[in-house]
Amino acid sequence: MIASKKVRYPDLRKVEIYVLDDGDREEIALIAKELNVKYIRRDNNENAKAGNLNNALKETKGNLVVTLDADMVPRVDFLEKTVGYFEDSKMGFIQAPQTFFNNDPYQFNFFSEKNLNNDQDFFMRRIENQKDIYNSVMYIGSNAVFRRAALESIGGFSTGVITEDLATGMFIQAKGWKTRFVNKNLASGLAPENFSDLIKQRDRWSRGNIQVARKWLPLKIKGLNKVQKLLYMDGIHYWFSGIYKMIFMLAPLWFVLFGFYSLNARFSGILTFWLPSFIASQLAFNRVSQGTQSILLTNIYETVMAPFISYSVISDAVLKSKKGFTVTNKGYNTNKKYYNWRLSLPLLIILFFSIIALCKSIFVIFNILPFESGKDAIYINAFWLLYNVFILIFAVLVPFERPRFRKSERFLSSKEAQLLDKESHLIIDCKVMDWNELGAGITIECNNKIELKEEQKIILSVNGYELESVIRRIIPKKGGTNIGLIFTSLNYEQYAYLITQTYAVASSELPIREEKGNNIGKLLFDIFKGHFILKKK
């Protein structure tokens, strides 16, 4: 809420902020009142999020409507970077990518926070950008600005499915409105922080896409052109990839262990059809990803999710289950490490039998064991078994949950600051290394001994703001000292300043390169180093 109040706009009298609450939470109403933010309460949660948004449309009047999930924090330049597009009278909505402050389970549990992108970045920053060329940008539920007239032309946000966003954007485009994707980090939130919550989120997304296809098949939507229909069908079809991945993993097992054929063809015939397809898909993938994603890493992600997404898709597409909307838990922290055996069991079983099948293949190749179908049939299956085992080893490491100690994410900084005593007298100059609304890490470049001690009350002075703090940790280093601080008493202006310098900092002022080139070699090194260090500790 505070970040929304700090968003820049030429005439802030035209900006109204609303908190939409369909859970009747009195504490939320009190916070909204304290911050002078308008509060819209709904007595029920009919149609979940879409119903909540539609209810708010009836209570508001603005020509432009921004939708933000509760965990999404807009940057101060959000409106500056989006509203200008609506000078085009046919512009229906603007979509910015969802980005995240924290590390997802892949980044965190692989010990590869510095070398891996968030697994959603490929879609959010690359695929959406390509869809923009064909006016097929998908509305992703948050970080978007709508023209009210566009929403009214389709009767408001689509209801009756658990992913209202996909259908809403599709219908707006079908009405002839233009849409744009602004590929800038304009609002960030929290990604799922453990394997269980990640599965819940993807379960909801997959079921929602299937529900959209059952209720409003894109191929039959009047107003969409052929390319738009194809791209929407492709987005829905993606969720069936879990089934394909399961077949891909199980087919070599069926053949090597039980002699079941999934494909009866000569090796030369397979190469004739498969090799050109593989090369073409690899080139296309590299073109779209622009070095920020790899095929191997994508296969790891898809393998991890395959058993669960397959179940979700079959449940909704075939069995037509009635599972409703569920909210993904955010803000998870724990000081424990554990392995999620229950959720990893399907992957462990497939890995176990893949290793057995691979060993049998090797014995057949070296004439230790006979094989009715002959050795020629074994070679290609042995290759895919080896590949699957390699991928599955990575996959079964994802449910290994590391401790998450911090209650809030820290943000890098290089701001000059000063440490003051309780009477605001200067102790020494310092620099902020990282901080959030709860505390800060600072560094002092000084060879002389500093008379500071843990639990001492001091003041951190930054840009005119004097932040009352307590020293929690002092770590000597060569040529200076690193100090960990906890803020003890912040007024509104101080708290708002910290928010604008951390969560809501302008997109142009982000201190680090947002996208990294995913590298499987670095990932291997990170995993082995991380598990060795964690075990040692």
What are these regions (language model features)?
Residues 2-14:
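Short, acidic, metal-binding catalytic loop of nucleotide-sugar glycosyltransferases
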Residues 13-23, 40:
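Short beta-strand/loop segment that forms part of the nucleotide-sugar
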Residues 40-64, 76-162, 174, 195-236, ...:
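Long helical/loop segments within the catalytic core of UDP-sugar-dependent glycosyltransferases
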Residues 69-73:
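The conserved acidic donor/metal-binding loop of glycosyltransferases
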Residues 338-537:
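Structured alpha-helical
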Residues 171-187:
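Catalytic donor-sugar/metal-binding loop of nucleotide-sugar-dependent glycosyltransferases
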Residues 20-28, 44-45:
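A conserved acidic beta->alpha catalytic loop
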